[in-house]
Amino acid sequence: DKVVLVTGVSSGIGLGVAKEFARAGAHVAGCSRKSPDDASVQAFREVVEQEGVRSFYRPADVTDAEELKGFVEDTVRTFGRIDMVVSNAGMNVFEGAEGCTEERWHYNLDLNLASHWRLARLCKPYLEKSGEGVLLLMTSNHAFSSIPGCFPYNVTKTAITGLVRSLAI
């Protein structure tokens, strides 16, 4: 019975990842910024639990260090461990370098880069204790090919590659 922690489970890749791990027999802890009674959160719970495994959900903004810490701690309280982390939460910002404000720049760095580091740091002791811990940080083709008009997103996705290499040392 593996336990997988996934961020951004209310839609898209995060929901798909949760479904596939549940299908493989893993219990899934998920977070997003959505309220627990939101239809998208109910969909997360349903796709996981229909596979005969347990789900846990806690609303958490991954840019808020305390909310992220609470999510990790509640996951461990619920399941007793974490075997795998899929740090998926993020968003694209369609702005060129010249139009990107300081505020948008820093928010993008926080959401699409720093949140991955925070989550890795928080989960590291549990992954090591697992003995088979796996950490997946979601990136995209923007890490390898900059797309015009996606300035801050391109930068953060490229930086995730460096973050992964540094964490692997």
Stretches found by the model and what they are:
Residues 96-97, 101-109:
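Substrate-binding pocket helix/loop in short-chain dehydrogenase/reductase
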Residues 125, 169:
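Alpha-helical segment proximal to the catalytic Tyr-Lys
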Residues 10-12:
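Conserved glycine-rich cofactor-binding loop
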Residues 120, 156, 164:
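Active-site helix of classical SDR
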Residues 140:
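Residue(s) in the substrate-gating loop at a strand-loop-helix junction
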Residues 24-41:
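Conserved glycine-rich Rossmann-like NAD(P)H-binding loop of the short-chain dehydrogenase/reductase
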Residues 100, 146-154, 166:
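Active-site loop-to-helix junction immediately N-terminal to the catalytic Tyr of the SDR YXXXK motif
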